[in-house]
Amino acid sequence: MVALYDYYKNSISKKLMLNFNYSSVMQVPKIDKITLNIGVGIATIDKKNLDFAISDLTKISGQKPLITKARKSIASFKIRKGYPIGCKVTLRGNRKWDFFERLIFIVIPRIRDFRGFSNKSFDGKGNYSIGIKEQIIFPEIDFDKIDRIRGINITITTTALSDREGYALLSAFNFPFRT
């Protein structure tokens, strides 16, 4: 099992249960899934860019990404409905905990000029979204073998009912929020 999950089960869930006065352990918020997304707008011009993005996301997540397609045609962006414009991965179970542990302890400390994440990126229901500007901060990506710098959107979906509960959950994991 993953050490971070054991820490959640044995320590964090008990703290949250006391702080929010939950009557059942099932009410305690938990991390439901983590979604990684790379948008490749240049894929309309050159399809190889999408292949490189898929390769990067496969290395980072450990599973094959789903290709996202345009929902409608937009002439100014030169895309048509059904064009592949990105890729995404949804992590659950042990892969979710492995990725979250790597994110907190390895990836985030490698971000240049990092001062903490904003606590305003919650969506109102306890889910948190992060935008990372460079995929090269992940140790799985070899700097010499990339074709270009790409950003990655990371969404941490929780079972929390409010932003306050989601913030308390992520703070308990020592997630680096700006103070």
From Swiss-Prot:
Gene3D superfamilies referenced in this protein's UniProt entry, alphabetically: 3.30.1440.10
Coiled coil ranges: none
InterPro entries according to UniProt: Ribosomal_uL5, Ribosomal_uL5_bac-type, Ribosomal_uL5_C, Ribosomal_uL5_CS, Ribosomal_uL5_dom_sf, Ribosomal_uL5_N
Gene Ontology CC entries for this record: ribonucleoprotein complex; ribosome
Keywords carried by this UniProt record: Ribonucleoprotein, Ribosomal protein, RNA-binding, rRNA-binding, tRNA-binding
Listed GO biological process terms: translation
Pfam families linked: Ribosomal_L5, Ribosomal_L5_C
GO molecular function annotation: rRNA binding; structural constituent of ribosome; tRNA binding
Subunit structure: Part of the 50S ribosomal subunit; part of the 5S rRNA/L5/L18/L25 subcomplex. Contacts the 5S rRNA and the P site tRNA. Forms a bridge to the 30S subunit in the 70S ribosome.
NCBIfam families xref list: PRK00010.1 (NF000585)
Function statement: This is one of the proteins that bind and probably mediate the attachment of the 5S RNA into the large ribosomal subunit, where it forms part of the central protuberance. In the 70S ribosome it contacts protein S13 of the 30S subunit (bridge B1b), connecting the 2 subunits; this bridge is implicated in subunit movement. Contacts the P site tRNA; the 5S rRNA and some of its associated proteins might help stabilize positioning of ribosome-bound tRNAs.
Family recorded in the similarity comment: Belongs to the universal ribosomal protein uL5 family.
HAMAP family: Ribosomal_uL5_B
UniProt name for this protein: Large ribosomal subunit protein uL5
Source organism per UniProt: Buchnera aphidicola subsp. Baizongia pistaciae (strain Bp)
